[in-house]
Amino acid sequence: MSEDIRRGPGRPPKKRVVPNFERKGILEKPVRPQSRLEFSYDNPLIFKNLFIYFKNLKSKNILVRCTPTEITFFSRDQSQASFVIATIDGKNVNHYYASDVFWLGINRELVEKMFNSIDRSFLKITIVHRYDKPETLFFIFTDFDIDKECTYQITVSEPELDMDLIEMEKSISEERLKNYPLRWEFTSKQLKKTFSDLSNYTELVTIEKLGGDTPLHLYFQKFNSISYHEMYKSSNKINLTSTIPKSQVFQINVKIAHIKSLASAMVTDKIRILCEENGNLIFQSEMDALMLNTITLNNMI
């Protein structure tokens, strides 16, 4: 600041000191002896955003699978056409421990109210499930500025597993993802605008790409009425990649209503879109240690 410009009245803002949290990853033993699950993470707002996404999709119940290496959240949207699978790898958090593979069922509305009260003053979330209280999941939020801990005890259940939902995890296996013939990236704003605009005219849109170095093409045509073509000519600007042979055409028809609702629900800025030959679509996004996948099935639209 120049010497001839005087600071206004009042004290200068106090600079916040953020603790340096070490990310130790997966532990061989829990910090608390009674813990079946311990999860400590220095980015609580990631969970808040995840449950905002579940709320936007009007998901009801959420299945939580804990394994010795990761924690995964499974749910469906209200239309039952889209399946959400969100995974956090234990090696990417401050510390993680799970004794074995087990499932918990939680009510989205109940947990959502808890996360609504969490703001940036909380720098760490700890989730604990104990052997002596199997019906309870503990959420501990820590504000280091004033040395405050807020603990919520949420009732959980041993859920009835939704096998169709769990089966969707095969769609996002590392081996399966390598074989998707078409993928590109949109910002959430681009995705929302494209499908919102299209919804004014048609229920279905065609996604098409020729083999080789050709544009991504979205279009619809109503005979004797109106047609529309949206071309993405620079593949690098949307990170467009494909494995379509030069002599072939990749083409699928997608129901706009489902994609429009997903676009409106998104909580990340960047979305990776993958198309399968049978018309299934996968929407991928990342939030720090969280990988968020939403699968929309063509045979359900």
Swiss-Prot record:
SUPFAM superfamilies per UniProt: DNA clamp
Superkingdom of this protein's organism: Viruses
GO BP terms, alphabetized: symbiont-mediated suppression of host cytoplasmic pattern recognition receptor signaling pathway via inhibition of IRF3 activity
Xref: InterPro entries: DNA_clamp_sf (IPR046938)
Keyword annotations: Host-virus interaction, Inhibition of host innate immune response by virus, Inhibition of host IRF3 by virus, Inhibition of host RLR pathway by virus, Late protein, Viral immunoevasion
The keyword DNA repair is annotated on this UniProt entry: no
Coiled coil feature spans: none
Signal peptide: none
Inducing factors: Expressed in the late phase of the viral replicative cycle.
Family, similarity comment: Belongs to the asfivirus E301R family.
SUBUNIT field: Interacts with host IRF3.
Role of this protein: Plays a role in the inhibition of host innate immune system by acting as a negatively regulator of type I interferon production. Mechanistically, interacts with and prevents host IRF3 nuclear localization to inhibit its transcriptional activity.
Protein name from the UniProt record: Uncharacterized protein E301R
Originating species: African swine fever virus (isolate Warthog/Namibia/Wart80/1980) (ASFV)
